[in-house]
Amino acid sequence: VKGKESDDETSSPVMKSMNITANTTKPLTATSVDAANTYDRYEKKNITVRFSGVAQGFTKLTSIEYKFVPKGVNNKTIAYKTGSSYTVKNGNCGRFYVRYNTPLGSTEIKLPGFTVDTKAPTSVKIKANKSGIKTLSTSAKNTYSKRIKKSVKFTFSANYGTSGKSMTQYKFVPRGKKASKYKWKTANSVTYKTRNKKVRLYVRYIDKSGNITTKKTNGFYVTKK
């Protein structure tokens, strides 16, 4: 994967350039270590961050150190390690600090925090307030034998993993129709009241990193009584 490179927004009297390359969706632009911590970035693949730099002509770069600090942890409690890259894997949320060392002094920078969530939502459920409605794989055979009186309310739930919930979307698809022909609507629940029309319900669960799990119900129809 081709990485994205970003020169930092900080300056250093001993460093000519301090570069960060990462396979993130957006470049990681460096800030001062005193800048507020941010965690509004979400990635759905493991992220490898690479550090490089060039010292000013009157000195030399002796080493590059880094540390990945989990969200909520004081960076002073984590020790620096020497190296030029580090991979953040699934289930982690945190920020990088990078230190460039020369005989004339060191320069320390911080990168924006981000979350790595490579897993699609799990424990997904389509709950109905009437019995006989099942949560199924989208590849399951469609059946339409379930009869429901008056109306049925569906609520959607899932475990969204490290990144958390972005949204749930749904669509009702009539018997004999392709699901791809119908548009998604965003909601956490929906009530179906249309009479004597055989349909199935599709629901997709989306986390903040963009991972998606899609399920459907067995087919059903609503009668007056």
Task: Give the predicted meaning of each segment.
Residues V1-K225:
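Low-complexity, disordered linker/stalk regions enriched in Pro/Thr/Ser/Gly
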